[in-house]
Every structure is written in structure tokens, then in C-alpha cells.
């Protein structure tokens, strides 16, 4: 992969010429964790994560909020991806680190960053080279035999798969709210078809594989039911991050956060820049189900 010069007086840092077109999702957890090791410590002589936050347009109060988190660098990058899905690129991150004078980070992490980007671009190239199929057919064919017959109405031999309008991401303690959602969206004039894990998914298969299959290939949208209990759920965390990792151009349209209870904890930072449906707001509650339904009915 081609590299570009880093400029006079700069420490070497390999950067493929097209890194400004590579989204931040290409960077894996290893690189993000090591980046935090460099930027999280507050230093008087070197630019830390707060300087990067200012470069990304965060104000004082936003930086103070991130400061309370265990890994502010990781949270900052997640928020950047959510706020600017088209502009949050690896090339832009490296350019900001150069502007901040963090050539040590570029030198130490440059090889790992380039390797992550190569892997990402290879995956995208392989996807582009796949034989073209009719989208409606392609999206309904399970990737492996393990994913045939995973819902109650699937054909066990893979000849027909059940499709849904929305995948509902929720924790067990919010199941009562989900049952109300079923009544309001499925059993009314909206006649939507929701994928509710406890009701629609057959037992006996890997939870993570099923979740990925349903979110990416079987459901047009994903509703995330937000509460304090949601924040404690590893399963909900995986499902949300998986949905956000899908194509940047479609993810904001795909994912709809719903706040179902008053929260003591802070709203998830990775969802902060997506418009929510707030069930707890008495002033807008009468419009709640209609707004949510119409959002799910969009093409």
C-alpha cells in the first residue's frame, strides 16, 4: 500500500495515500487501547486527549464529562464516529495527531494503524468482488448452516427465512416495556413486525452469531431500549456496537434509541448524537408511538 510523506521535521509515520477515505471503524481495539495509553495520562509537556477533544470541537463541559470516564480517549473516538460518520477517518485522526506534535504516537502506532487499514480495505474489496444478487434474496440467505432455522417461522432447511421491520435491543428488566411496544406497533394499524429475542428466536444457538445475523441481514432497523439496566447488559452493548459498526452511511438511519425509563446514569455516549424517542417525557408521550412507528416504516 502506498505511503505519503509526513512533512519536514516530523517523525516518520506510515500513512497510505487513501487513509482519508478509511473510516475510523477500521481501527481495532488493540490500536485504540494503545492510543489511550499515550493520550489518557495528563501531561504538562505533551498534548493529551483533552487537546485532541478541543481539535474535534468539544467545549469545556463536554471535556469535563469525558474526564470522568475510565478511558476518555476511547469515548472521544466513539463520539466522533457517531457525530461525524462521514468525516471521522483514520487519515483525519493522524493529521490531528501531527498538528498536536504527537510524533511519538505516529511512530509507535503507525505500523499497527496501517495494518488495520489494510485488513479493512481487503475486507471491503472481497465484499465488492462477491457475485451480485437480488438484494431481497441476498439479504435473506443465512451465511452458514448454523444460522438456518433460528426464528420460530424459519424454514429449518434454509428455503425460507423470516424477515422483520426492526430488531429490538433490550435487557430482561425492560421486557414489560417491550411487551407494550408489541401491542402498540404490531397489534394496531401500523402492523409492524418486530424481532423480539425472547419471543422469536429459537434456543440452542450462539447468541452473538444470531444477533449479528438478525441485525445485519434480517431487520431493516434496530430499536435500542435505553435504561440504567441496559447499561449493565453485555448483550445489549454488543448488539448496539455491532449495529454502529455497519456501513457509516446507513447506520444513523438504521438505529433508533428509545429512552423507556428515567435514568440515574448518563445516556450512552455512542448514541448521544442520534435523535431519540423519549417515552419518559410527559409533554411528548402522546406522539411517542406514532413517531416511532413512522420512523420504522420509512423505506
Swiss-Prot record:
Domain writeup: The intermediate domain (ID) is required for the phosphorylation and activation of IRAK.
Localization of this protein: Cytoplasm; Nucleus
Gene designation: MYD88
Identification of the protein by name: Myeloid differentiation primary response protein MyD88
Residue ranges of the region described as Intermediate domain: 114-158
Location of the Death domain: 34-113
GO CC, one annotated term: cytoplasm
Classification via CDD domains: Death_MyD88 (cd08312)
Keyword terms, alphabetized: Cytoplasm, Immunity, Inflammatory response, Innate immunity, Nucleus
Amino acid at each position: 500500500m502506498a505511503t505519503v510523506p509526513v512533512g519536514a521535521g516530523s517523525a516518520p509515520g506510515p500513512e497510505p495515500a487513501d487513509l482519508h477515505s478509511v473510516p475510523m471503524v477500521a481501527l481495532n481495539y488493540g490500536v485504540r487501547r494503545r492510543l489511550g495509553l499515550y493520550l489518557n495520562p495528563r501531561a504538562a509537556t505533551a498534548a493529551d486527549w483533552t487537546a485532541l477533544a478541543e481539535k474535534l470541537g468539544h467545549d469545556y463541559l463536554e471535556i469535563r464529562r469525558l474526564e470522568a470516564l475510565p478511558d476518555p480517549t476511547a469515548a472521544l473516538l466513539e463520539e466522533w464516529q457517531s457525530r461525524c460518520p462521514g468525516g471521522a477517518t483514520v487519515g483525519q485522526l493522524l493529521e490531528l495527531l501531527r498538528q498536536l506534535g504527537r510524533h511519538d504516537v505516529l511512530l509507535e502506532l503507525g505500523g499497527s494503524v496501517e495494518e488495520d487499514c489494510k485488513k479493512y480495505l481487503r475486507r471491503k474489496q472481497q465484499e465488492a468482488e462477491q457475485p451480485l444478487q437480488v438484494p431481497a434474496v441476498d439479504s435473506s440467505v443465512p451465511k452458514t448452516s448454523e444460522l438456518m432455522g433460528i426464528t420460530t417461522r424459519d424454514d429449518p432447511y434454509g428455503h425460507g427465512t423470516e424477515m422483520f421491520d426492526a430488531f429490538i435491543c433490550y435487557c430482561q428488566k425492560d421486557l414489560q416495556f417491550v411487551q407494550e411496544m408489541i401491542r402498540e406497533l404490531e397489534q394496531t394499524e401500523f402492523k409492524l413486525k418486530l424481532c423480539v429475542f425472547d419471543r422469536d428466536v429459537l434456543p440452542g444457538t450462539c447468541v452473538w452469531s444470531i444477533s449479528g445475523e438478525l441485525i445485519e441481514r434480517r431487520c431493516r432497523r434496530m430499536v435500542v431500549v435505553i435504561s440504567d439496566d441496559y447499561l449493565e447488559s453485555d448483550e445489549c452493548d454488543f448488539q448496539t456496537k455491532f449495529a454502529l459498526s455497519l456501513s457509516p452511511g446507513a447506520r444513523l438511519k438504521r438505529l433508533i434509541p428509545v429512552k423507556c425509563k428515567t435514568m440515574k446514569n448518563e445516556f450512552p455516549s455512542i448514541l448521544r448524537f442520534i435523535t431519540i424517542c423519549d417515552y419518559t417525557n410527559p409533554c411528548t408521550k402522546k406522539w411517542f408511538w406514532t413517531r416511532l412507528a413512522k420512523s420504522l416504516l420509512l423505506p
